[in-house]
């Protein structure tokens, strides 16, 4: 399984979902690895990469091969920081991990149209690396438009979206009651609902359901 976990926006919980999915798969005995090709806003140690390493046991260096200090899209970070990286080297690293792990979860930065390099987005990367797509979006007001546009763009660029995760259900936002139904009607994909929690680790039943949801929708 080779999967791009992308978001409808920044801060929607991609790393949180990737961590819990990876942890559950590993606990089931699968050989699972994570890859965050580029992490920005890194001060000393990559925060997202460090969390993912706790789920899989990988080194942070293996998970995050490219890092920038500014909180920007990868391409913007290359412009602001005056340094670059080679897509070819990223591709080689991906191929190495693909051979090493049965399940490889690739976490994007921001959304699927975020540029990694000039004229090269995460949608391009998913196409070139032959990744299927899992979308993570917010549970509340505004998520219908954001989720539909992400799904539509992915489909328009020839990608296969296998699932939609709506993250952060509180029970307080009235839109949460109808958002999943409407998104399913618009995309044909039944979203998986994840509650808002204070901890980084989902309750076991929710985590199990998350992994079952993804595995049931994935056809090699």
From Swiss-Prot:
Pfam families: AAA_26
Catalysed transformations (reactions): (7R,8S)-7,8-diammoniononanoate + CO2 + ATP = (4R,5S)-dethiobiotin + ADP + phosphate + 3 H(+)
UniProt keyword Ribonucleoprotein, yes or no: no
Single Gene Ontology BP annotation: biotin biosynthetic process
GO-annotated cellular components: cytosol
Subcellular location: Cytoplasm
Annotated binding of substrate, by residue: 40
UniProt-listed InterPro entries: DTB_synth_BioD (IPR004472), P-loop_NTPase (IPR027417)
Pathway(s) the chain acts in: Cofactor biosynthesis; biotin biosynthesis; biotin from 7,8-diaminononanoate: step 1/2
Keyword Nucleotidyltransferase appears in the UniProt entry: no
SUPFAM superfamilies for the chain: P-loop containing nucleoside triphosphate hydrolases
Predominant place of localization: cytoplasm
Binding residues for Mg(2+): 15, 48, 107
Known EC number: 6.3.3.3
CDD domains the record matches: DTBS
Cofactor(s) essential for the protein: Mg(2+)
GO molecular function terms noted in the UniProt entry: ATP binding; dethiobiotin synthase activity; magnesium ion binding
HAMAP family: BioD
Record note on quaternary structure: Homodimer.
Function statement: Catalyzes a mechanistically unusual reaction, the ATP-dependent insertion of CO2 between the N7 and N8 nitrogen atoms of 7,8-diaminopelargonic acid (DAPA, also called 7,8-diammoniononanoate) to form a ureido ring.
Family the UniProt entry places it in: Belongs to the dethiobiotin synthetase family.
Protein name: ATP-dependent dethiobiotin synthetase BioD
Gene name for this UniProt entry: bioD
